[in-house]
């Protein structure tokens, strides 16, 4: 039996330089915040094509933990951005976030 969680992790993989736009759109749609991580594709030259479309090596990953109710609006807002209308310019997936908690003490 699968239990529905209250939160989901939204992973948005974008070409380098596009993460801030994705984060702005996500915030407007209800995201509380997020983390941007620099990334690099590590596939072979053949792997760097997605259904015949060249994929840039330099990437950024936007990670957002959001309440389930906001996830559809957040993903739709990001998908509608003009910079993501080109084929293979972004990849979005969501995963259930079953255990969410803060560690340590707040920074002063």
Show where each model-derived region lies.
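Positively charged, small/polar-rich N-terminal and surface patches that mediate targeting and assembly
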Residues: 1-108
């Amino acid at each position: 039996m699968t239990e529905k969680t209250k939160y989901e992790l939204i992973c948005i993989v974008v070409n380098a330089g596009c993460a801030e736009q994705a984060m702005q759109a996500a915030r407007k749609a209800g995201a509380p915040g997020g983390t941007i991580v620099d990334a690099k594709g590590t596939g072979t030259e053949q792997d760097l094509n997605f259904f015949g479309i060249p994929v840039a090596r330099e990437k950024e990953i936007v990670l957002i933990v959001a309440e389930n109710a906001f996830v559809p609006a957040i993903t739709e807002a990001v998908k509608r951005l003009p910079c993501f209308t080109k084929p293979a310019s972004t990849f979005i997936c969501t995963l259930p976030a079953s255990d969410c908690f803060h560690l340590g003490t707040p920074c002063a």
